[in-house]
C-alpha cells in the first residue's frame, strides 16, 4: 500500500463506519461463529471485508473512517423521538467497536468524530472540504441518506445486501434510480420519512406521491409555497396536516456540511506503509483466515500477499526402498500423524476407493504414498495385487496397494507407536475394511475430537492449523474443483494430492501438543482420554458391522405408503372442498387462514406459517389440519427412508452403514447420518413399520436383535445432581415416577392419580430438564397460563431441591461461562450474559439441560466403551455378538440366539457405568426385527 505518485489523481474514500458495523453484525451474526475463545467477530469481519474490497476495487490514495462519537446529538435534542425505536447495541457487538478501531490503527487510517454530531455529519463536512479542494471523494456506506451528498466529484459506493454487490452512485445514476437530483433526497425523506431513524415524514404520502411532488415542485419549501395548488386533494390535505412533521423531518434528514472543528487533514489520511504485521497478527487472533491473502502490499512487500503455507520436506514415495526407509524413520520417532486419502467421504465406502496415505513422523517431515491414482490419462484405478508392473510404471511408479499395506501394517497395528489423526474413525474404517489386517490399533490423539471438546465451532483441520499454528493448509477444492466440475482425488495430479496430504498429516502431528495443553488447562484431558478417544474405535466397529435391511419389507411398505399418501391427499381435498398443493406453504396458508379462517399463526413473508409446531395446536380445530399433518408424516417417512434406504445398501456387505458422530451435538450426544437412523419416529405406527425393515442377519444361526435401554436416565441423573430426596426416594422404591410426581403435585394418594394427572406430570418431569416455563406449558398443553403457573409452583414445592439446583446451575454457568457434566464435559455459553432477555433465557434453558443430558450421554458412552471391549474379547474366542446401533438411550445388539443370555448379562452388568445415588434401571426387548421386539 504505497503512497500515490507525484502527479496521480487523488481519491479520498470516507467510510460510514457505524453503518457498515451494524449492517455487518446483523448480516453475519448467525452465520459466522465466534472464535475459539468465544469472541464474537461478525461486525469486525464485515468491516474488514468491506475495507479490503475498497482497497481492491476503488484503489484510493486517502482513507478516513467517520465515527459516531455518542448517541447524544443535536437531532436527539431537537426531537426525542429521533432513533428512539433503535435498540441498544447488543452485548456481543459492543466489544467489536474497539477491535475495529484496533484494525484501523494498524492500517493507519484516521478516525474522525465530533461530539453532538453523527458520522453522517462528519462525512458531509469532510466531503465538502475535499470537494472544495478539487479532490475526488467516494463515500462507502449502506445508507441512502448519503445520496444527498452526491455531486460531480463526490460519489456514494453503496452495498446492496440482497444483490451482494456494490453500486456506485454518481449524479446520473441517482437520477436514473430515483428520478430526481441527489440534493432532493432530503426533500424525499421529509415527505416519506425514515422508519430506521424514526423520522416521521408526512402521513398519507408514499413513495409514488413523494416523487410526484418533487418532480413538480422540487423542494419542500416550494411545495409549501404552492400548497393551495397541490393535487390531488388527498395529497394536499396530507401535506397540510403534516406540515410541521415535514419541516421537522427535513431538518432531521439534512446532513450537516460544516461541523465545527472537523478539518480535513489529507496528509494523515494518505495511505502510507501500514503495519502489516499488526494486521496479520490481529487477523490471526480473530481467525480471519480467508482475508489474509487479500491484504494489500505495504512498502517493501511483494505485490502479492506471501503464502502462509508451511514449508517442509514433503515427499512422494514410489519405491519400496523409500517406503521401507520411511517406516524406519517412523519407528525411530515413535509417533506419527496420518491421513487416508480416498474418493468417498463416507468411511465405509472409502475402503473401496482408497487413493493413498500420508504420514508425518516429525515437524516438517512427511511423505505421501500413492497407490490408487488413475493411470493412462486417468482412465482406471491402480489398486490391488496382480497389477502388472508396466501399469505401475504408467502411473508414475505407484506402488501396489498390497505392497504398501505390507510395509505400513506394523505402524498401524503395533501398540507401541503413537498415532495421530483428524477424524481418526474415518482412517480406521477406510483401512480396516479395505484389509482386515490393517485395522489400526486405537489412535492416541484425534485433533477433531480435541477441538470439539474445547468448544471450537469450526473443527476443520484448516481452521485448527490457522488458529493454533498460524499456518494455512491446502484446500483440496483448489485442485479438485467444486460442484459439477469436481474431480475425485484419484483423478487429480499426484503432486497436488501429495502436497495437500503431506501438509494435512504434518499439521495433525504439530497440533497434538498445543491441543493437549489446552485440554489440560480446561480440565478436559480426562474426558478426552477416558471417554471420547476410547469411543472412536467403538463407533468405528459399529459402523463396520452396519445393519441388515429386508428389501421385501421396504418394497411392501413403499406400496402401502403410496396408497396411504393418496388417501391422505384426498382427505385434505375433501376437507377443503377442492384440490390444493399440500406441499406449497403459501397456498396452504391461504387455504387455512383465508378460506377456512383458522386462527392465524406466526406471520411470514408469504403468509402465515404452516409448520408442524404451528399446526399442532390447531389439530382439533378443523379436519383438514389432521389430514395435512398425516400427509406430511407419510411423505416424509417415504422420502427420507423408504425411497432412499435401498440405495444406501452397501453392495459389498449387503448392509446399511450409518455414520455416527460424537463431535456434532454440544451436549456430547451421538448423532447419526447417511442415513440418519436416530430420527425414525418411535411412537408412530408408520415409524414402527420402517423399523421392521431393519433385521438381524449375517450373525450366525437364528440371529436376533437385543435392545436394552436406560429407563428415564435423564430424570435419574436429575435426582442425583439436584440431591432432591423426594425424587431419589421415588426412584429407589422403583415407583412409577410420573404417578409419584402427580401424587406429590396434586396432593393425592397414588391410587387416586388419574391418567390425565400422570400425563401432565410426565410433561413437566421431562420439561424441567429443558427449562419448560409456564408459558411453554400453557402453549403445549392448551391450558390457561395461571393454571400452568400453579402446576409449576406445586411441582417445585414437591421437589424444592430441583428448583434450587436449577437456579444455582444457571448462576454458576453464567459466572464461569459454561455448564458442565458430572465428568467435566463443558458447553460454553456466552449468551448467559446477554442483555437481550429472549437470548439470555434461551441460554439459561440450555444451561439447565446440559448437565443432565450431557451426563446421561457420558454414562452411555462409558458403557459402550466397556461393552465393546468385552464383546471384542469374546469375538477373539469365536463369539459373534456385536453392538450395532445406539439410538439416544437405547443400545441394540445383533447376536445368535445361542449367545443372547451372554450378551444380556454383559450389557446389564456394564451399562450402569457410573454409580449414582439412584439405581439405573434397564428395559430390554428381543426380536427378529427392530420394529417387532418384545
Task: Annotate each predicted stretch with a short phrase.
Residues 238, 242-394, 456, 480-685, ...:
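Conserved "right-hand" nucleotidyltransferase catalytic core of DNA-directed polymerases
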Residues 110, 164-192, 196, 309, ...:
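Active-site-proximal helix-loop-helix substrate-binding element of RNase H-like nuclease domains
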Residues 21-27, 147-152, 345-346, 355-357, ...:
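Short active-site loop/helix that positions an aromatic residue
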Residues 487-490, 537, 541-544, 599-601, ...:
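Conserved catalytic core of nucleic-acid polymerases
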Residues 563-570, 574-626, 797-845, 849, ...:
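C-terminal polymerase-core module
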